[in-house]
Amino acid sequence: SYYHRAYEYDQGHLEGMLGLGRQLLRHEDLEASFKIYQNIQLQHLDRLYGEQAREVFFNAGVIKQRLGDRMRALDYFEKALDYDPEHKESINALLENYEATKEWDRYIDLTRQLLAVEQDPKIRFAKLSQIGDIYAEQIQDPGMAVQSYLEALSLEEQSVIILRKLLNLYTNTRQWVEAVDMLNRLIDLEPDDGKKSRFAYTIGVIYRDEVHDWQASVDAFDKALDADCHQLKAFEAIDRILTERKQWKELERAYRRMLKRVAEFKEEEKMGSLYMMLWQNLGEIYRSRLGHMQSAIQAYEMAASLSP
C-alpha cells in the first residue's frame, strides 16, 4: 500500500506512520499497528499537536483493549484525554472500562465531563438519571442520588420515573416534607383515580404517623376519598383521628362529605350498606356527641328508610 511504501522509504515520516498505523488497525493487524504507534511516541512525541497525539494514544488504547490488556488501555485512553479533554470516544471507552471494574467515582467524573459539553436535553436527562442510579444503587449515597435526580427532573419535570425514585429516597431517609411534595406531583400527573387516591392516602399516613399533623392528615385522607370513595380505609382513618381528638363538629362534617360521595354509588350492594351505616352513625354523633336531637332523629329516620 501507499503507507507501507512511504514507511519503507522513510521510517521516521510522521504522516506516513500515522496512516500506516490506521491502516493496520483497520485490518486488525494489532501487534504491527501498536508497534507503529510505539515508534511514533518514541520519535515524534514532542512534535505531536493535540489531534495527532490524541489519535496516537486513543488508537493504542483500542489495540490494548482488543488484546485484553485493560490496564494499559486505560492509561492510553487517559493520555488521549490529556490532549483532548472533550474526545467522546476516549471518554466512552473509559466509561466502559470503569463500569466493568466498578470504579464508580471515576465513572461519574467522566460522565460529568461529557455533560459539560452535551447540549441535547434528552441525553443530559438520561446521563443525569444514570448518575443518580449509580449513587443510589452502587455507591449508596442517597444525598448525591437526590441531587442528580433533581438535576434530571429540572429537564423533564413530568418524569414519573424520577419522581418515584426521589419518593423512595426521601421516604428511606425520612425526609417527609419532600416525600409529600413528590406524592403531590405524582397525583397531579396521574390520570387514574384509584392511583390518585392511593397516593393521597399515603400522604395522610405520613402526616399522621411521621409528621404528627392530624389536620393535614385528615385533609389528605379526604382528598383520597374525593378521588375514590371506595378507599374506605381513608374514611376509617378520618373517623379514628377525629374521634380520638373529640373533634365532633369536624367528624359530623366528615360524615356529611362521605354521604355525599357514597350517594352516587348507593345502588352497589356494598356501598348501599355503607350509605345506611353512615346515616346511622351520623345520628349517633348528633345524639351523643353534639346533643342535636332533632338532627339525630332525622339521620336515624334516613337510616331506617334504607334498611332492607
Can you name each region flagged by the protein language model?
Residues 1-308:
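Repeat-based scaffolding regions
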